[in-house]
């Protein structure tokens, strides 16, 4: 979270960066206190589930601080609506849901727009699992790997898979969007972040217009790749035959995706007529 805060500092967007710094400091202190005072005992699947849920709740609460500080919604918003909207945006980011009530993100400071996409990217990076791996030995995390879509890989191998997906793929899609989409580098990074989180927090409301067909194609390809199981990516990069046995699931996913594409193509004219 310190990355978008530093970006805001460099760009001179102090209001945005201060809010993000507050979230970073609060999250770091809370994590340190809980890790210091908490008991490190072996985690079963039920306990792992509770830890993951509570971790995302805390992430979302602290992640809402920049929204509360900058108020990117509308003037005159009451405090309860401001908190609810901020918490919604933050939760939507860290859970990679991508749901947003901000209709014109292009009016936001560049660093804050980057922050929104960054929270989605961090959520897709399975930030909670990475933090857990730093503080707990692998023998105590046996139940955690099932959250990541595979029972055949060791937890450390899954972390390597996540790193490969989000570092290599992010770099590739930043270059593709910047080169062929004719979008500035900062928006290209933000768009790449949200693409690998399967969409949602775009930096501008017009970036996905139908005229940008090349950009749309790159984004769609990125979202499909990001939706594939972690174990499949691990098998591709490591040439592990056992890890690529999920081809049947992937085929079913692609068939369902194709059916819904045709369904929306059939429905789309009715929407046009209603407009």
Describe every region a protein language model picked out.
Residues 1-275:
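Membrane-proximal intracellular helices of multi-pass ion channels
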